[in-house]
Amino acid sequence: KPLFNYVRNATVKNLKIQGTNIDGYGLVNCYTVDYGDDGDYWGTGVPETISIENCHILSGTNIKYSGFLGGYASGLNVVRFSNCTVAQNVTIGYGMADMMPDGLTHSTGALAGDFNGYVTNCSSAATVMGQDKVGGLIGAKGQSMGPCEIVDSQFTGTVVSNGCAGGVVGSGYSSGNSPCVTIEKCTVSG
């Protein structure tokens, strides 16, 4: 199971994750919105859901779903990844045939499945597998209003999918008011 079941307005840093078969997500099962001081998650003073800094998934680890994060927040409540790595000989998504309770497939990525937020200076050399929306770093943009920006990051592993797939992000989010996914100064090889 993940190290944390639920987080809100959290910072996790300087952590190494290793496990033969982690039955779930690698770090956090669920993270949630925080409606801030005024009760409105659109206003100022809305904290980030989680910041993950200098965390690493070590070689030999197998994770059933996405690497670090499970269920996502929404809107402007973002996640930040910085200086995180997923080593070679790591398998993300070994439960790719499994369905969620509502019958939908999981979005799968070495860092996160469904994601709103910022990734800076992260890398993965993992094998990432899933049914649909599978990305080397991020499975899919999670919600229409939140940002999804990946900068100065790289993927050198393998992506296996029966549907939408990408070396950095597996799928965007289609909506008239949705900001685009931003990918800058990233490399993919493998």
Regions found by a protein language model. Give the residues of each.
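Surface-exposed loop/turn motifs in large extracellular/passenger domains
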Residues: 2-190
